[in-house]
Each structure stands twice: as structure tokens, then as C-alpha cells.
């Protein structure tokens, strides 16, 4: 197979992967060792969720609408056609995406101008993202790398179901909790590798873990206590813990004595820990939860603890897009609705996930030109006048920024045009820059990835570090490029024999230091950190990683790839003082509580056929008391209308969900994550 170093695109943690391709299809994803991030482990979403790259219905050539049909264009026609329309438009806006790379979002921003660039994230979600970034940058609290999470000795998870939204963090938390047994063994001078002895000494001793969520989580089995409550009440718990740790933090009134006793236990555990860790994120749909997490961390820091804070975002490049800035999707739709913008370019974004489908469709229908650049067939293509066929992560290069602010580069695995010369799939940044150049009647400036990165750094100093995330295209080892294929790669002459017996030249990669070939350097001892695949003489491939490490289980011999862009400052934020009121259930009104699923909540991996067989069917969760009031049982279909659409789903009963709320699986087909926290008024049994 042909490999390249890449970054997992299915959540915000940024695990390192080696995707393998054969015959123009992605065939598997292997874990790529990074001693600072994921070391030996990947979650199942990352390992098996790549099926969307191989879908047959992906846009493979640019198409333009003619009446009710689309006609296929070549690259030149697409650029000229789009440029003609953009020249006539009085105002062009661009809608970016948290699943597109820094380079692609920047190319769109350059095309439309910084003041016309919108992030493509809903306003509420963007506010939470900016708040999380503010806490990480200015809070004065250290953000640990994924590997470092394992060294903490007390963990508080506020409002985030980490097993479903950042599964690799959940594994790190499990390892952290086990640290108690290792400590006890170390006190008896037992070596770290003697696992049987450590388990024997530790028995069931664990470091304390406290979890808050709207319902049960998969971490409950190792948690000292789980608080199942509406999101506001979870935030109130966080504020109360912060006040108990430091009485200058805002107080919370109206807490009953049972809960106060639990708070005392949590405070004792956190205050007694040397290295407490607070985990929160944007997925609960609440800014107050993030503020509460920041307050707890600040209170612990004030007591002299070596405290860490981890924020989990929603998409692979959410943090990068937050650092870039721009208006929210709601602002962009407002521009289209008022008619002040008459052309819109949408980059790798299914807008139905970030705003109500009715509003998106109405806004796009008003625009004389809708241009979509994407590698998946999304619902908004129904409204598109021109579709540019972009390359997915496996066919392109770029930089993404993970939840801790680590910039990491992913590289192209294969060139799809080698197997089918009718395919015209370019990186989004290439399409957008080519269009920009055509509109301005000038030559293309960015002929390779390094040019884009230099342009990003010149325009946005906050991204200066991305230059160091990986070596540039001129990097060589003993004058050689690095091989993407192991030297036992076989049958290359026969691969295209069904098309033509004349073998064409291998694709030439001018963007990176890799070659689409087995010819090149692949020595384990070579001075490089970007490793496409692990191979060493006498070792089966994935077991060869020990040859690339400075010590077994340590860092890579020549340093782990990636560079941190966010470091905690010396100062700190003041305490957040707005404590939310507690949740009050109201008759005839229900609030949507967010549930997430590792298989199904992510926009791209839910398209993979293997995931579709593992995904739960969409459901609506009710508390038993609410179900009794409505007169429904598990399995009964209930319907509600939201935003002009009627949704009908089967009921599931959950004891953990508080009355007055309904649980929906966020991100599943037809259930946009933007629904979290919305109110429903007309929940009723569906008419058969």
C-alpha cells in the first residue's frame, strides 16, 4: 500500500494516522506513533471511519447548473465561468468550515476579503469556541497534551461526554485514574513494567474522577461520582466547587444539603491532589459550563496546585478556525437574506448542521450565485449553481489545529487522477486561489503548499508556528525524497493495465518532501519526524515503531511532529461571575439535551458504510415521568415540530435524564447539533 503521514479528521483531538491506499481507494488507517499525542492508540471512529473517502457519489469533476441539470466542466471552464460571475457580483461572501484546513479557509478569506469571511459555525457555538480559546490563552492554566493527561491525579469532567466526543481523551483519563496503583507500587519500589505486581498492590485503588453530564456516560464505571443533571445545574455545580475552593469566587445559592455534601467530597479530593485536571468543552451547548471549568481551575491554581485544563471542541480544525476569526454563520445568512450579498462561496461545509435547514435553504435560494467547494455530496448542493470538486484529507495537504492548540500537518496519500484521468479533484485552497487569480487576471502565486503557509503567516501572525509543524518541500535525506511506498510494494506496472499497457509516469509531488513511489528514503534511523509507515528489517510493520523511538514508549527519535500555538500566559482571567439559574421543568415545554455517539455524531464518518451498520437509529429520550404524562412507552413514535418541519422518532426511556428535558442524538442525519438547548412545545404521540 501507499502511505503518508496524516491527521485524523473525525474529532478535535488530532491523533496521528497513516492512511494506506491501493488502486485508488483508501484501504486502511494505521495508528502513527506520536509520543506527545496518541502514542500507540486510536479510537474506532478514527481507525474505521474513512469510508466517506471511497464513496462513489463524491463530486469528481466541477459541474455547473444549466436549468434543472448539471453539466460537467473542465478546470479551465470552471475557473472562467466562476470568475465571470464573481466579477459581476457587487458583494461576495465566503463561508468557511471547521473541517477544512487552515490553508483552505485562508484561501477563501483572501478571495472574498477578511470583512466578508464567515466561519460557517452557528453564533452560539462560535461564542463558546472563542470563550474556550480565551480560557486557554489568557487563563494562565496549562493545557496538557493528550499523553500528559495520563499523569494527573484527580480529574473533573464538566458537561462533556468524552468517550463519545473525544474518545482518545477518555482512554487517557482511564490511564490517569489507574495512576493510583502505580503510585502505591512505586512507594514499594516496584518497577513500572511489572503490571501484575502493580495490579496486585493497587487492588481497586483509583485516583478520583468526577463526571457531570445530562445522562449516564461510559466513564461512570471508574468515576467516584457522576452527576446527572441539566446543563445549567452542571455549571452551577462547577461554580459551587470553585467557591468552596476559594471564597472570592462567586457563590451559588439554593444548593440542597445532599449536593453540598457531594461538593465537599469533590473539593477535598481536588484540593488534596498535586495535579488536578479539569476537562470541559463546547459540546454541552453552554458557555456557563466552560466558565465554571475555568473558575475551578483558577481556584485550584490559587491554592498552589499544578492544575491543567483541557477543552474539547467539535471538529478537527475548530480551534484553528476560532483563531482565524470571522463572522458567524448566522451573520452570513443575514447578509444573504437582506440581499446585501449576491454571491456566496461555501467551503467544505454542510450548512444544515450549523443552522436550521429551512433558513439555510431560503437564504441560499435568494442568492444569484451559490458556489460550493466540497469533497462530499451535501444537501446544499441542491441550491448550488457551481460545484468545485475538492480533495478529501487523503488526496490533499494542509494544516489543522487540535483542541490543545497544536498545529499538525497532514499529507496527500495518493493522486486520484493517476487511476482515472477524467477526475479533477484539487485541494480547496488550490481551487480558491486559482479562482482569485483568474478574477484578478494574474498568474497563480501559490504553486505549492509552502507558498500558502508563508502567505498565512504574513497575514496572521498568530499562525507563525505552523511553518514549523513539518519540514518544507525542499527537505531531503541524503538528497532523496521520502518514500510513500514500502520497497516491497508490488504490481505497479499491472495496476493500470486494464486502462492501458503503457505505464504513465508516477505523479510528481511538488508540495511536499514525499515521493509517490517506493524510490526514496525510508530508513528507521533517518533524521525525520514525519513517518509515512513503520517498517524495519525483521519486524512486522506496526511492531517496528520501537525502531523509531528514543526509548520504547518514549518520544520519536527526532522529535514528535507538530507545534503548540497556544501557551498559558503568566497572568490570569478574573473569575466569571454570572452563575446561571437552576433548570426548572415547565409543563408543556421540553428542552433538548445533547447526546453524542462515537459512531454517528460526526459529519463525515457517519457516511461510511461500516458505520451506518453500527450507528443507533435516531431516537428521542424521555424521563419515565415525562413518558407517563404523554402516555407513551419505549418504542412508541412521538413527533414534534421544529422550524417548520415535523420530526417523528421512537421513544427511549432513560432514568438518568432529568424531567422536562428530551434527549436527541446530536449530529445524526436530520438532527443538527445546533438543536442543543432549544425548546420544544408540541411533543405528542405520532399519528399512525
Name each model-derived stretch:
Residues 1-2, 98-99, 283, 313-316, ...:
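A glycine-rich phosphate-binding loop feature that marks nucleotide/adenosyl-phosphate handling sites
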Residues 1-257, 264-265, 528-543, 547-562, ...:
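N-terminal export/assembly segments and adjacent metallocofactor-ligating motifs
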Residues 89, 152-153, 223-224, 273, ...:
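Short, well-ordered alpha-helix to beta-strand connector turns
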Residues 92, 117, 209, 276, ...:
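Hydrophobic/aromatic residues located in beta-strands of well-ordered beta-sheets
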Residues 92-101, 258, 280-285, 348-352:
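Conserved short loop/turn motifs at secondary-structure junctions
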Residues 157, 163-218, 330-421, 437, ...:
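A cross-kingdom feature strongest in bacterial/archaeal respiratory oxidoreductases
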Residues 271, 276-338:
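A glycine-rich, hydrophobic/aromatic-adjacent loop/helix-cap motif
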Residues 428-447:
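Non-catalytic, well-ordered alpha-helical segments in soluble enzyme domains
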Amino acid at each position: 500500500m501507499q502511505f503518508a503521514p496524516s491527521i485524523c479528521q473525525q474529532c478535535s483531538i488530532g491523533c496521528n494516522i497513516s492512511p494506506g491506499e491501493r488502486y485508488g481507494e483508501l484501504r486502511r488507517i494505521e495508528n502513527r506513533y506520536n509520543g506527545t499525542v496518541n502514542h500507540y492508540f486510536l479510537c474506532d471512529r478514527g481507525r474505521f471511519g474513512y469510508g466517506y473517502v471511497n464513496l462513489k457519489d463524491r463530486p469528481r469533476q466541477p459541474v455547473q447548473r444549466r436549468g434543472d441539470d448539471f453539466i460537467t466542466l473542465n478546470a479551465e471552464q470552471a475557473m472562467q465561468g466562476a470568475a465571470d460571475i464573481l466579477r459581476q457580483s457587487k458583494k461576495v461572501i465566503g463561508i468557511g468550515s471547521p473541517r477544512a484546513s487552515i490553508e483552505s479557509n485562508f484561501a477563501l478569506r483572501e478571495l472574498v476579503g477578511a470583512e466578508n469571511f464567515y466561519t460557517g459555525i452557528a453564533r452560539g457555538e462560535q461564542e463558546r469556541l472563542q470563550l474556550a480559546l480565551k480560557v486557554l490563552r489568557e487563563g494562565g492554566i496549562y493545557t496538557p497534551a493528550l499523553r500528559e493527561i495520563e499523569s494527573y491525579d484527580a480529574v473533573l469532567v464538566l458537561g462533556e461526554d468524552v468517550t463519545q466526543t473525544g474518545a482518545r481523551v477518555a482512554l487517557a483519563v482511564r490511564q490517569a485514574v489507574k495512576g493510583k496503583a502505580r503510585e502505591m507500587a512505586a512507594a514499594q519500589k516496584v518497577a513500572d513494567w511489572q503490571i501484575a505486581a502493580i495490579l496486585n498492590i493497587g487492588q481497586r485503588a483509583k485516583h478520583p474522577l468526577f463526571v457531570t453530564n445530562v445522562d449516564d456516560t461510559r466513564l461512570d464505571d471508574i468515576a467516584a461520582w457522576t452527576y446527572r443533571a441539566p446543563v445549567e445545574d452542571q455549571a452551577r455545580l462547577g461554580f459551587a466547587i470553585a467557591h468552596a475552593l476559594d471564597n472570592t469566587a462567586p457563590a451559588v445559592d439554593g444548593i440542597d444539603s445532599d449536593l453540598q455534601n457531594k461538593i465537599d467530597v469533590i473539593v477535598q479530593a481536588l484540593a488534596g491532589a498535586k495535579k488536578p485536571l479539569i476537562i470541559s468543552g463546547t459540546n454541552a451547548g453552554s458557555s456557563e459550563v466552560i466558565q465554571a471549568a475555568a473558575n475551578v481551575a483558577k481556584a485550584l491554581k490559587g491554592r498552589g496546585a499544578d492544575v491543567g485544563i483541557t477543552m474539547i471542541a467539535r471538529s478537527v480544525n475548530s480551534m484553528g478556525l476560532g483563531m482565524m476569526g470571522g463572522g458567524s454563520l448566522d451573520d452570513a445568512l443575514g447578509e444573504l437574506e437582506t440581499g446585501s450579498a449576491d454571491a456566496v462561496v461555501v467551503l467544505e461545509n454542510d450548512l444544515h448542521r450549523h443552522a436550521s435547514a429551512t433558513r439555510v435553504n431560503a437564504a441560499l435560494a435568494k442568492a444569484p450565485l451559490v458556489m460550493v467547494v466540497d469533497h462530499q455530496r451535501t444537501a446544499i448542493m441542491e441550491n448550488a449553481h457551481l460545484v468545485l470538486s475538492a480533495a478529501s484529507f487523503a488526496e490533499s495537504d494542509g494544516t489543522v489545529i487540535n483542541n490543545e492548540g497544536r498545529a499538525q500537518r497532514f499529507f496527500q496519500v495518493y493522486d486520484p487522477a493517476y487511476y482515472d484521468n477524467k477526475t479533477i479533484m484539487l485541494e480547496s485552497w488550490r481551487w480558491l486561489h486559482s479562482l482569485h487569480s483568474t478574477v484578478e487576471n494574474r498568474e497563480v502565486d501559490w504553486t505549492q503548499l509552502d507558498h500558502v503557509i508563508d502567505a498565512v503567516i504574513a497575514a496572521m501572525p498568530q499562525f507563525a508556528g505552523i511553518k514549523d509543524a513539518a519540514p518544507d518541500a525542499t527537505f531531503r535525506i541524503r538528497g532523496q525524497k521520502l518514500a510513500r511506498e514500502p520497497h516491497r510494494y508490488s504490481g505497479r506496472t499491472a495496476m493500470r493495465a486494464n486502462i492501458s499497457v503503457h505505464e504513465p509516469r508516477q505523479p510528481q509531488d511538488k508540495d511536499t518532501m514525499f515521493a509517490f513511489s517506493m524510490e526514496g528514503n525510508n530508513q528507521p534511523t533517518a533524521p525525520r519526524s514525519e513517518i509515512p509507515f513503520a517498517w524495519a528489517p525483521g519486524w512486522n510493520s506496526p511492531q517496528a515503531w520501537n525502531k523509531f523511538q528514543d526509548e520504547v514508549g518514549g518520544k520519536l527519535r527526532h522529535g514528535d511532529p507538530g507545534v503548540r500555538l497556544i501557551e498559558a500566559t503568566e497572568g490570569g482571567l478574573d473569575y466569571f461571575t454570572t452563575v446561571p439559574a437552576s433548570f426548572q421543568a415547565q409543563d408543556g415545554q421540553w428542552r433538548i439535551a445533547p447526546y453524542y455517539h462515537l459512531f454517528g455524531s460526526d459529519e463525515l464518518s457517519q457516511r461510511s458504510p461500516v458505520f451506518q451498520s453500527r450507528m443507533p437509529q435516531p431516537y428521542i429520550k424521555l424521563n419515565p415521568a415525562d413518558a407517563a404524562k404523554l402516555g407513551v412507552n419505549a418504542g412508541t413514535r412521538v413527533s414534534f415540530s421544529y422550524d417548520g418541519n415535523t420530526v417523528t422518532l421512537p421513544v427511549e426511556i432513560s432514568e438518568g435524564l432529568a424531567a422536562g428535558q428530551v434527549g436527541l442524538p446530536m449530529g445524526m442525519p436530520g438532527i443538527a447539533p445546533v438543536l442543543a438547548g432549544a425548546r420544544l412545545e408540541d411533543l405528542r404521540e405520532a399519528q399512525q
